[in-house]
From Swiss-Prot:
Annotated keywords: Chloroplast, Membrane, Photosynthesis, Photosystem II, Plastid, Thylakoid
Cell compartments where the protein resides: Plastid, Chloroplast thylakoid membrane
Keyword flag Cell cycle: no
GO cellular component: chloroplast thylakoid membrane; photosystem II
Lineage: Eukaryota, Rhodophyta, Bangiophyceae, Cyanidiales, Cyanidiaceae
Protein family according to the UniProt entry: Belongs to the Psb28 family.
Oligomer and partners: Part of the photosystem II complex.
Name of protein: Photosystem II reaction center Psb28 protein
Amino acid sequence: MASIQFIQGVDEDIIPTVRLTRSRDGQTGTAVFRFVQPKLLQQQGEITGMYMIDEEGEIVTREVQAKFVNGQPQIIEALYVMKNAQAWERFMRFMNRYAEAKGLSFQRS
């Protein structure tokens, strides 16, 4: 089953919005994840990155930032950069598994 973790061993239950961009030649792309009031804000532990885990293994990004409202963390944003077509395809396989596990669908904008 596919999951996302910020603290290793603790699955994040909040479903993020995900914004994808891809270069015209299809070689590179980015995914921006936005979690509003994620569970990790109530957890104890060090956030060392965002871990996308499925049966193929683990995709990791260290580009994780918190957004604060009135001095309290409310939103976590993570950026994953795909530097080649293979990374894009691997990411899309993960996202398909994650969507299936969470009962979601892909929607083009």
